[in-house]
Amino acid sequence: MVLCFPLLLLLLVLWGPVCPLHAWPKRLTKAHWFEIQHIQPSPLQCNRAMSGINNYTQHCKHQNTFLHDSFQNVAAVCDLLSIVCKNRRHNCHQSSKPVNMTDCRLTSGKYPQCRYSAAAQYKFFIVACDPPQKSDPPYKLVPVHLDSIL
């Protein structure tokens, strides 16, 4: 039992910094965080666009994709046929048409001086959708995760 505590402490220390990378800011709903991270109707330069995300998380996100469409149009994808997500849940939905998007990838820097490269794309996307929370728009389902780009 004496050996368990140091091992548990080591696991918590190693796991601690990784956990926030996948979490969303608790003062935001998952749908609002999705909108901040992935909805950008008019393309912005990646360094500028990513600073908005990185200011919430206090670190340089390694990669992010911005869909150049409205939240309303992306939320409408949630009404399409459900498919299996990467995590094996059945709450994903594929867009019926490709959209313009920008893929931003970290090239250098440490927060807050993060630097990104940009790649314009025109592809289909898959989003995970959940029922809305109280402060979300009143759709039946809202996008909460960008599962993949096709």
Curated annotation (Swiss-Prot):
Instruction: Return the CDD domains for the record.
Output: RNase_A_canonical
Which tissues carry this protein?
A: Highly expressed in spleen (at protein level). Has little or no expression in healthy kidneys (at protein level). Detected in interstitial leukocytes in infected kidneys (at protein level). Expressed in ureter where it localizes to urothelial and submucosal leukocytes (at protein level). Strong expression in lung and thymus, and lower expression in heart, placenta, pancreas, liver, brain and skeletal muscle. Also expressed in monocytes and neutrophils.
- Cellular component terms (Gene Ontology): cytoplasmic vesicle; extracellular region; extracellular space; lysosome
The family database entries (SUPFAM superfamilies) matched by this protein are listed as: RNase A-like
Sorted alphabetically, the Gene Ontology BP terms of this entry are:
antibacterial humoral response; antimicrobial humoral immune response mediated by antimicrobial peptide; defense response; defense response to Gram-negative bacterium; defense response to Gram-positive bacterium; defense response to virus; innate immune response; RNA catabolic process
Q: Which residues form the active site?
A: H38 (proton acceptor), H145 (proton donor)
Location in the cell reads: Secreted; Lysosome; Cytoplasmic granule
Kindly list the positions annotated as binding substrate: K61, H62, Q63, N64, T65, K86, R105
One Pfam family assigned to this protein is RnaseA
Q: Name one GO molecular function term.
A: nucleic acid binding
- Which sites does the entry annotate for glycosylation? N55, N100
What task does this protein carry out?
Ribonuclease which shows a preference for the pyrimidines uridine and cytosine. Has potent antibacterial activity against a range of Gram-positive and Gram-negative bacteria, including P.aeruginosa, A.baumanii, M.luteus, S.aureus, E.faecalis, E.faecium, S.saprophyticus and E.coli. Causes loss of bacterial membrane integrity, and also promotes agglutination of Gram-negative bacteria. Probably contributes to urinary tract sterility. Bactericidal activity is independent of RNase activity.
Q: Protein name, please?
A: Ribonuclease K6
Give the organism, scientific name: Homo sapiens (Human)
